Amino acid sequence: MIIPAIDLIEGQVVRLYQGDYNQKTTFNLSPLEQLQSYQEQGADLLHIVDLTGAKDPMKRQTQLIASLVRELDTPIQVGGGVRTEAQLSELLEIGVSRVVIGSLAVKEPELVKSWFVKYGSDAICLALDVNINDQGEKIVAVSGWQSGGGKTLESLVAEFSTVGLKHALVTDISRDGTLKGANTELYQEISTAYPEINWQASGGIATLADVNAVKESGANGIIIGKALLINQFTVEEAITCWPNA
């Protein structure tokens, strides 16, 4: 599945290089028009990252996201700055289909597990941003990549499998925003090890060949941001490569 994505800072469409707020590119685009274009080209799921909220949860762009959800028919997955159950339930109440939870799953796993039990495993996607060290360990970063986490991807998957983990978004931080291609070995490894999880691949997608490579790796979906914004290819072309299931 092709999952077009936009990142938002104070209502503007942006891209960060490797999660660094100091390496930001701003695009002179309307978030709604951009997402409508992706919807019209056949996207079955859209992905929005609230980067303002990720940095400061008090400044989450909930009203903007609510207006986008109202105007679009396609299901929307939203991440960025969700730290409390109230914030999670607010997003679900305004019509967001699935909420992405990142750092909190590492920092407060028991709390996040309770949300899986209460809201169901379809309502939550874990975002696992990994740094692969020299030993090949997949260490999950926390706090918008601004500090290390210490837990491995495998240990987190084991922990959340007990509450029915179904959706996980995995980014190899070293590839994000680089257009250097996805880490297909990573996706092949985890989709083989945990076939029950719908893995969303993210980071580094530059060409349709990259899209095809991720599809072949066994991932269930691919999040594409920058490549679409700079017209490397279209959503329509990507779906031709990887038809929606």
Curated annotation (Swiss-Prot):
Query: What is this enzyme's class at the first EC digit?
Result: isomerase
Q: What metabolic or biological pathway is this protein involved in?
A: Amino-acid biosynthesis; L-histidine biosynthesis; L-histidine from 5-phospho-alpha-D-ribose 1-diphosphate: step 4/9
Principal localization reads: cytoplasm
Read off the lineage from the record: Bacteria, Pseudomonadati, Pseudomonadota, Gammaproteobacteria, Alteromonadales
Q: Name one GO cellular component term.
A: cytoplasm
EC no.? 5.3.1.16
Catalytic residues in the record: D7 (proton acceptor), D129 (proton donor)
Q: What is this protein called?
A: 1-(5-phosphoribosyl)-5-[(5-phosphoribosylamino)methylideneamino] imidazole-4-carboxamide isomerase
Please state the gene responsible for encoding this protein: hisA
Give the UniProt keywords, A-Z. Answer: Amino-acid biosynthesis, Cytoplasm, Histidine biosynthesis, Isomerase
Q: Which HAMAP family match?
A: HisA
**Organism field:** Shewanella piezotolerans (strain WP3 / JCM 13877)
Q: To which protein family does this belong?
A: Belongs to the HisA/HisF family.
